[in-house]
Design a protein with these regions (language model features):
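Residue-level signature of alpha-solenoid helical repeat scaffolds
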Residues: 383-384, 415-418
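Primarily the internal scaffold of c-type cytochrome electron-transfer domains
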Residues: 1-22, 28-33, 45, 49-76, ...
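Exposed beta-sheet edge/beta-hairpin loop segments within beta-rich domains
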Residues: 83-85
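Flexible loop/turn segments at the boundaries of HEAT repeats in alpha-solenoid HEAT proteins
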Residues: 425-430
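Conserved hydrophobic register position within alpha-solenoid helical repeats
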Residues: 413-416, 431
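Membrane-interface segments at the starts/ends of alpha-helical transmembrane spans
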Residues: 77-81
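Conserved catalytic alpha/beta cores of large enzymes that bind or transform nucleotide phosphates
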Residues: 89-103
């Protein structure tokens, strides 16, 4: 297949589509550049990912634009499809192939990339399988128990091994060193993204494309030992149970505690009665991929009123304010994230509508729960105050940074330390 589009020199030309990859409903197309005629068939040269994309469900083409970049991309822009930010080797291959070796030659400025399988295969999670095969093919009558199965031990009482095996491809992180295998320590090889203003909201909710590990380790579920495979099939990644059963399969409390109107205050069977819509709100990435926040938090419209952070209640109810918005703006407000982004960008009309919704939701929670409503102090209050330069904010952020794990998630504490360090405050030690 061929595509006729603008090349890295700015000229329109034909390119051969060499590979196709993606995850339903996203299907993307790749073009190989600079391949020498004598390159072995087992090696891959520089590969660039086209921005023209196919939606397999809606069966239509669409342009996958970068976030917050509405204008046309010039050929010298890193975000142009021929640029480094659209390069398969640096942006995609780590998590969409197995045993990747980039083999970049700086002298030649060329790639000689290899991989075992162009997919997420067994060894991507279970580690090298050579010992496992050796044991399986052994003619000995006895299994060598010293080696177990010859694979990474992802099961057991400790959930950390499994979580840290999933984390490299389900987190936003920088690479510290190469060679991670299933069962290794995540932080020995990667630097996890902190709660920076452009990637997370101040309260730790997902904002930019940060995937799920960073949000999950903030959750009470994580601290209670819940692991990925408690909810997801490890091989298909599909949920093990439908609907609210994903949650009630563990939350088997006395009848009438959770999956009933007295708890969720919505009509059974509606969107508002779904556990995930309140505790795991979604944002859409890459135009078609809805990803849920895995911090599994209780909605806090009170924090939204005070700090401008999102909350799941307003996520559903903000659309009730659409008629108050100028008609020409309405088509751009398709999702809650669009409202939040417009408000943050300075649209006073949209910001007022969002705040009105937050206040309405906060009042509803107050009416429902009254004196039983829990509004504990949250680390986001200190982070926002510090960023705004408020008096006494440094001491509050120091308090967050030095709190024990059971009071404040380690990612929030590390982020507090990062904020303090960036401001020039030194000699801070977290326990």
């Amino acid at each position: 297949f061929m595509v006729y589009t603008e090349g890295e020199d700015g000229e329109m030309q034909d390119f051969e589509v060499k590979y196709v990859f993606g995850f339903s409903p996203l299907q993307q197309y790749m073009v190989e550049f600079d391949r020498p005629v004598d390159m072995p068939p087992t090696e891959v040269a520089r590969v660039q990912v086209l921005r023209i994309t196919w939606d397999t469900l809606k069966e239509k083409w669409f342009y996958l634009r970068p976030p917050d970049v509405p204008e046309k991309l010039e050929p010298d822009d890193p975000l142009h499809w021929t640029g480094v930010a659209q390069r398969w080797q640096t942006m995609c291959a780590d998590c969409h192939s197995t045993n990747l070796k980039r083999n970049f030659d700086p002298a030649e400025q060329a790639y000689h990339t290899t991989f075992s399988e162009i997919d997420v295969s067994c060894e991507a999670c279970h580690g090298p399988g050579s010992l496992h095969l050796e044991l399986a093919n052994s003619k000995s009558l006895f299994w060598d128990r010293r080696h177990g199965y010859g694979l990474a031990k992802l099961k057991g009482e400790n959930a950390e091994t499994q979580l840290q095996t999933c984390a490299p491809c389900h987190s936003r992180r920088g690479v510290l060193s190469e060679g991670f295998h299933g069962g290794d320590e995540f932080c020995d090889f990667y630097n996890l993204e902190l709660l920076r203003d452009d990637t997370y909201f101040a309260d730790g909710q997902i904002k930019d494309e940060v995937y799920v590990y960073g949000s999950f380790i903030q959750s009470k579920m994580y601290h209670k030992g819940i692991r990925c495979t408690d909810c997801h099939d490890p091989h298909s990644l599909k949920l093990k149970s439908p609907g609210n059963e994903t949650c009630t399969s563990c939350h088997q409390h006395a009848a009438g505690k959770y999956d009933v109107p007295s708890h969720h205050h919505h009509v059974p069977g509606t969107a508002g009665a779904m556990c995930v819509n309140c505790h795991m709100p979604h944002r859409t990435y890459m135009d078609v991929d809805k990803r849920r926040d895995h911090s599994l938090r209780v909605p806090r419209p009170d924090l939204s009123v005070a700090l401008g952070t999102p909350n799941a209640c307003s996520g559903c109810h903000v659309k009730d304010q659409l008629k108050s918005i100028d008609q020409q703006k309405q088509p751009s407000l398709l999702e809650y994230a669009d409202w939040i982004e417009a408000a943050e960008a300075g649209d006073e009309q949209v910001a007022a509508a969002v705040l009105k919704t937050d206040e309405w939701c906060d009042a509803a929670c107050e009416k429902w729960y009254g004196e039983n409503r829990k509004q504990p102090k949250h680390f986001s209050e200190a982070i926002v105050a510090f960023r705004n330069g408020e008096p006494g904010a440094m001491n509050e952020l120091l308090r967050v940074a030095t709190q024990p794990e059971e009071l404040t998630p380690v990612l929030a504490r590390a982020s507090a330390l990062g904020e303090l360090a960036a401001s020039g405050v030194g000699n801070v030690t977290a326990k």
